[in-house]
From Swiss-Prot:
Native species: Nitrosomonas eutropha (strain DSM 101675 / C91 / Nm57)
Keywords for this protein: Ribonucleoprotein, Ribosomal protein, RNA-binding, rRNA-binding
SS bond partners: none
Gene3D superfamilies xrefs: 3.30.70.1730, 6.10.250.290
Subunit structure: Part of the ribosomal stalk of the 50S ribosomal subunit. The N-terminus interacts with L11 and the large rRNA to form the base of the stalk. The C-terminus forms an elongated spine to which L12 dimers bind in a sequential fashion forming a multimeric L10(L12)X complex.
Protein name: Large ribosomal subunit protein uL10
Amino acid sequence: MSHNLEEKKAIVAEVSDQIAEAQAIVIAEYRGLGVGQLTQLRVKARESGIYFRVIKNTFVRRAVVDTPFSGLAESMVGPLAYGIGSDPVITAKVLHEFAKDNDRFVIKAGAMAGTVMSGKDVAALAALPSREELLSRLLGTLQAPVAKFVRTLNEVPSKFVRGLAAVCDKK
């Protein structure tokens, strides 16, 4: 598909805007996947807040220049799809789960905060719990001592009432 110069500039600008707000980029080769499969992935990515698109590598190379993701430029070879997201774990997790179900979708590389990752590193990132899971674990850990203290304080009057009830039952 041929683009005129204005369309090319618009695509590069759109990708640059997404990259400016991104915390992570995952690159995957999609050779041999059907349109239906890619559409399913696009829907899931959109629901997760991930910008997922098949873009010409030259457009993305121009968009990542002078960004923390510029190290990815050498990995941009072949037919690639790009997942750009604000949460590195969710971005890696959504694309990795799709790759597990579809052998023809292969994660090639990724980047976050100036660090370029291999496909294996992206898989390891996908294995981490999400931000919400980590926050709920932290909240549970912080809440446990307080809850235990409250139960202990509540036990003293309860024990007294049970003792009075036992005395009343004897009489």
